[in-house]
Regions:
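Positively charged n-region of N-terminal signal peptides that target proteins for export
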Residues: 1-11
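Alpha-helical transmembrane segments and their juxtamembrane interfaces
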Residues: 12-13, 129
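C-terminal motif of bacterial Sec signal peptides marking the signal peptidase cleavage site
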Residues: 16-19
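A residue-level marker of the well-folded mature domains of exported/periplasmic proteins
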Residues: 23-400
């Protein structure tokens, strides 16, 4: 899969398009014909959708678009409503449309096949590289690296708790609230766990799922279940404030996702990782404005500014956390640390030396692509969306 890092960096730094309008504070103004549509599963009450919406607004400002040159549709379910929203955006004059949720994909593909002159871009999707439509594209980022870094922060907190006598090494058990048992979620919680174990060798983790991307009551209930089961630190791949507020109430440290929760949870929030979608939006908008092709499958990285962490909350984090994160981030960037180094985990007590991943996602759930090379599982290499779905030792699925 071709990466577009060099193209992206050039476009982010130099926004000089032929037929540009007058300059604005945000940069050169895109061609006046450009209009952009965004489709979101929820609204800004969801941390995931808020992160997407914030990036959409930032990218449009960067491109010099006026407020009447972009439309954001919120609370669009993962069903025919997504196609309807896409069609409405086309009717409104949008020539590039983005959608943010996994279940939007088939309906974005439906729209792309009907409206061939409009570009459709889907975040977290898996099918662009097999559909091969010239106007349909997937994007994701190597967020497993951000999760790993957040896991390092979690592991340091566990070490502090052990050193202070709050828990024993054997009691260093984390809990994780997941939305669905999809590869995207498994990849995220496994990388988080491996980051924690890289600094706290005795850590274990329990995972439970809510079967919803956003349900505050269920997420709070899941977090409380984990806490009551002896988990002393909680993280999540779910989009409400349910788990963080449960942690703040119980006084349990929390590593959140998609943004800082320090304002609401000052005593327990440690750090958060997130995808910054701005670089991809800028890249795609610029491609449309200049008549360039958008790649089928785009993967953002730490280097492109697509994987970011919030500031560390010194009130809750262990001493030296920010410095350790910076050290490990440098190692990830220079390649001396690999998140899914197969020497760092086992499955059923055995080192994994070969694994066929379901990269093509043809609906048969059968792996067809060898994902391990030179002792490393190559996540987001053959496709931008995650495909790591191994159940490694040390992590217990409470819902299995």
């Amino acid at each position: 899969m071709k990466k577009f890092v060099s193209m992206l960096l050039a476009l982010v730094m130099v926004f000089a398009l032929c037929a540009c309008g007058s300059k604005t504070e945000g940069g050169d103004k895109a061609e006046s014909k450009i209009k952009v549509g965004f489709i979101c599963l929820h609204d800004e009450n969801s941390t995931y959708d808020k992160n997407f919406i914030d990036a959409a607004k930032a990218a449009c400002k960067n491109a010099g678009l006026s407020e009447d040159q972009y439309i954001i549709k919120t609370n669009i379910p993962e069903g025919q409503e997504c196609y309807n929203a896409a069609a409405e955006l086309v009717d409104a004059g949008c020539n590039v449309v983005f959608a943010d949720s996994f279940g939007h994909e088939d309906f974005m593909i439906q729209a792309a096949k009907e409206f061939k002159d409009v570009q459709f871009c889907h975040a977290t999707g898996t099918k662009a590289h097999t559909e091969k439509l010239s106007n349909y594209h997937n994007a994701f980022a190597s967020i497993y690296e951000g999760r790993y870094l957040a896991g390092v922060a979690a592991g340091l907190k566990l070490n502090e708790m052990i050193e202070n006598g709050d828990i024993t090494a054997e009691e260093a058990k984390m809990g994780y609230v997941g939305a669905f048992p999809y590869a995207e979620v498994k990849s995220g919680y496994t990388s988080f766990f491996l980051g924690a174990r890289s600094v706290c060798p005795s850590v274990t983790m329990e995972v439970t799922f809510t079967s919803s991307w956003y349900d505050e009551a269920l997420e709070k209930e899941a977090a409380n279940k984990l806490i009551n089961n002896g988990c002393v630190l909680i993280s999540q791949h779910a989009d409400s404030m349910g788990a963080p507020t449960a942690c703040e109430t119980a006084g349990v440290p929390n590593v959140s996702y998609n943004g800082s929760t320090v304002a609401a949870c000052p005593n327990t929030f440690i750090v958060s990782s997130r995808i910054d979608w701005t670089p991809f939006f800028v890249y795609a908008i610029n491609c449309v404005a200049s008549g360039e092709d958008i790649g089928y499958d785009w993967t953002g990285t730490l280097a492109t500014g697509s994987v970011v962490l919030t500031d560390v909350n010194e009130q809750a984090a262990a001493a030296g956390t920010a410095e350790k994160i910076a050290e490990v981030m440098k190692a990830l960037e220079d390649g001396s640390v690999k998140v899914f180094d197969t020497a760092t985990f086992t499955v059923n007590g055995e080192t994994v030396t070969t694994y066929l991943a379901d990269v093509d996602d043809l609906g048969d759930y059968v792996g067809e692509t060898e994902a391990i090379s030179d002792g490393v599982f190559l996540e987001s290499f053959y496709r931008s969306a995650p495909y790591f779905d191994l159940d490694i030792d040390g992590i217990t699925n409470l819902d299995a």
